[in-house]
């Protein structure tokens, strides 16, 4: 029987799907940064174990975490959700999570490639795309490192960000960018499932080459689409398949990766 993907978002801190519900845990899980400040990596790892056991017990087989963006300052948008701004620390966290979570039947999703980096907290991702204007090599030499560690450790999935990486692809958000997907495949070396972040939490149509964002997401190389209005996203993709915008070969490639993931994750 085909395995259904049942995902939750249990990062700890501001994003807790289960631990903030009465009857699951006595208290919400702390954010990884809080755990790190209290007990270092050992504290983070202990909290990770508790999260995964909770998800597994509740019947989930995917966690939309960990956040492995590098955030060095409290005025950066991912500061409260990330563990640290230190490359080595975040890389170790990504590696540990992959090695611990997945053998216990819960796939992780490394997020948000290529990273929100220095984007300030004042940037509101609910009103449109935000721009990272750092040099491409600066991003590759720092922000890619945690993703490489998680991928090398066997991470099944990676989530793309809704950031415009100005020096790599100024016309698309990462989730809609063929160039950023190529970076993830070729430079990071990831061959697993790529998914979008939520595609309709803002209007990203200006970055979709005149297409519907869900359609451009498939064309860019995503295998799974996250959308609150999933019916609209589905119908947009179906229309694009029927009119030839999305080819059968592209669909088969994405489906093959998803099916391979399901087989591996069983």
Annotate each PLM feature.
Residues 55-58, 76-79, 235:
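Aromatic- and glycine-enriched pocket-lining scaffold segments that form the walls
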Residues 32-44, 133-139:
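A short acidic, glycine-rich active-site loop
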Residues 254-259, 263-264:
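Extended, intrinsically disordered, low-complexity segments
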Residues 89-250, 257:
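Second-shell residues forming the walls of enzyme active-site clefts
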Residues 13-14, 20-21, 61-85, 111-129, ...:
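Active-site-proximal loop/short-helix segments
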Residues 37-44, 74-90:
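Active-site cleft segment of glycoside hydrolase catalytic domains centered on the general acid/base Glu
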Residues 1-25, 47-69, 90-115:
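Glycine-rich, aromatic-flanked loop segments that form ligand/cofactor-binding clefts
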Residues 21-38, 84:
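A charged helix-plus-loop insertion that forms the helical arch/lid used to bind
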